[in-house]
Amino acid sequence: MTLGTEMSDNSLLSEDTDIDVVGDMGAKDGKYSDYHSDNDSDDNVARTPRGDPASPDLSSGSESNQRAEKSPKNALVKPPYSYIALITMSILQSPKKRLTLSEICEFISNRFPYYREKFPAWQNSIRHNLSLNDCFVKIPREPGNPGKGNYWTLDPESADMFDNGSFLRRRKRFKRQQSNEILRDPSSFMPAAFGYGPYGYNYGLQLHNYQQHPGATFSFQPSHCPLPPPASVFSSPTLSPFLGNELSRKSLYSQLSPTLPILHTLKPDAQSRPSFSIDNIIGGSGSTPSPTSPYTAQPGTHPPVIAMLSPSLAPMHNHLNLAHENLLPPGQNFSSKITNLNSCHF
């Protein structure tokens, strides 16, 4: 039978095929050489995985070369300090605790390579921080010290500006404190040599102290008018000689005050002045004006001085003359009426 022959052939094949149970075949072929038992300690040390070639790493070498080339550029890192801290460091390290702008920039450039490469791009920032912060005070250069630029120093009250002396942290913005007396009196900022007030020349001029008189009506005194020359005032030929001589020795304007009389009493010469007599006694006690009064001028004539000083006084002078003419007849005066009394003996 054909079936029997096939079965016989399969049996022959099965006898020739050997099954590896222990695993020696796998060890010989090399498929499971990586797997080993725990008891075989010698094989663990000696065996190495196959297919791992011991070739040098070329990629790691190229990366190390690139890092070496970039190392100088990475060293120029901006320092973690503000401009105020940099300026403070430069001033504190100086012997006199003051530096100019160029000296401050020189210190920063020598200390930090980053700013050395970036110079002078940051110089204006240093200048602005010096002028805008109250913790820095400008000191003018002495006349005998030649050079360019002013000195800069630290305000004594800004010593605790940084937290625990570390330049990395600043507590708060420093503001210069001013006393109340300085704020009340702005002129204290000005030197004593300048007498023009706190806002400079020709503004707020200091006036002289004025003492008010107790009898004055107003708190100010009116300015005196300039006096005209006597020759221009007394140029009229109708004025009597004694009147011109007397007025030329006196001031025409005393003070423009309503409490003073309009005109001073004129003094006649010694020749025309009567001696001690009844005329003086009656003239001082009576209601009629005395002969020495300015209103006893000749009727019909107007003194040019009164008309010149005030035109409003001329009608009043005419009224006084009319009243005087009504009392006495023309051509006579008061002294002629009492001439007979001088001969009487009492």
Curated annotation (Swiss-Prot):
Residues 287-296 have a biased composition (Low complexity). Residues 1-74, 274-304 are annotated as: Disordered. This is Forkhead box protein D2. Absent from the notochord. First located in the neuroectoderm of gastrula stage embryos. Located within the paraxial mesoderm of neurulae, but not within the myotome. In tailbud embryos, strongly expressed in the developing somites, with levels highest at the dorsal and ventral margins. Beginning at stage 25, additional expression is observed within migrating ventral abdominal muscle precursors, in cranial neural crest cells surrounding the eye and in cranial crest cells that migrate to the second and third visceral arches. Also expressed in the diencephalon. The keyword Transcription regulation applies. Probable transcription factor. GO terms for molecular function: DNA binding; DNA-binding transcription factor activity; DNA-binding transcription factor activity, RNA polymerase II-specific; RNA polymerase II cis-regulatory region sequence-specific DNA binding. It comes from Xenopus laevis (African clawed frog). It is found in: Nucleus. GO terms for cellular component: nucleus. Its main location: nucleus. Gene3D superfamilies: Winged helix-like DNA-binding domain superfamily/Winged helix DNA-binding domain (1.10.10.10). SMART domains: FH. Residues 78-172 bind DNA. GO terms for biological process: anatomical structure morphogenesis; cell differentiation; regulation of DNA-templated transcription; regulation of transcription by RNA polymerase II. Keywords: DNA-binding, Nucleus, Transcription, Transcription regulation. Residues 26-39 have a biased composition (Basic and acidic residues). Residues 1-14 have a biased composition (Polar residues).
